[in-house]
Design a protein with these regions (language model features):
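Bacterial Sec signal peptide processing site at the extreme N-terminus
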Residues: 15-32
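Sec-dependent bacterial lipoprotein signal peptides
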Residues: 1-14
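Terminal connector regions
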Residues: 99-149
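Short, solvent-exposed loop/turn segments enriched in Ser/Thr/Gly
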Residues: 37-44
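Asparagine-centered strand-capping/turn motif at beta-strand->loop junctions
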Residues: 47-51
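Acidic, serine/threonine- and proline-rich intrinsically disordered appendage/tail regions
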Residues: 144-160
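Short acidic, flexible loop segments centered on an aromatic residue
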Residues: 52-70
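Intrinsically disordered, low-complexity Pro/Gly/Ser/Thr-rich segments with frequent PxxP/GP/PP motifs
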Residues: 67-103
Length: 160
């Protein structure tokens, strides 16, 4: 009887222990749109769950900075996905951000070069009792012509 109690207590201790965080492979962030209102990105990640139990993803938070110093903002996107135990799960999340300042685009368009960006984010897992935030970072460039099209109004008869 004592051994049975010890086995039950050990099982409860393991079941209540905090899960190990998954590893996040930052695959890519693809700019899907740039216009006068804001910017859209598809964020692709690969999350590997090292635990013996499934983990639930609640949301993804992304913070975008352009050209090293232009803070576009932060957005949180609900994303309910299950990370299967002991497996890698691909995640693809669409993120839309409005320009925090209307003057953000003009200096970028006038710079005469592609615009580097960095997305710093967190993948939030768990529920109300236990929660884990796993950070990730993605970077890339936005082609100058995409910035120009967004920054300048169309002029009839002029092609860019």
């Amino acid at each position: 009887v004592r051994i049975r109690h010890l086995v039950v207590l050990a099982s409860l201790a393991v079941a209540c222990s905090k899960p190990m965080p998954p590893t996040i492979g930052a695959e890519r962030a693809t700019v899907t749109s740039v216009d006068a209102a804001g910017i859209g990105l598809d964020v692709d990640l690969a999350a590997t769950n090292p635990n013996a139990e499934d983990l639930s993803v609640r949301e993804l938070t992304a913070h975008l900075v352009l050209s090293g110093d232009r803070d576009v903002g932060t957005v949180t996107v609900p994303n309910t996905v299950t990370l299967a135990a002991g497996k890698t799960t691909p995640l693809s999340v669409h993120v839309s951000l409005k320009w925090s300042e209307m003057g953000t685009l003009a200096p970028l368009a006038l710079a005469g070069a592609d615009v580097p960006y960095v997305v710093d984010g967190t993948l939030s897992l768990g529920g109300m009792l236990q929660s884990i935030g796993v950070p990730f970072r993605l970077s890339g460039t936005i082609p100058r012509d995409q910035i120009l099209r967004a920054a300048l109004p169309p002029i009839p008869g002029l092609t860019r």
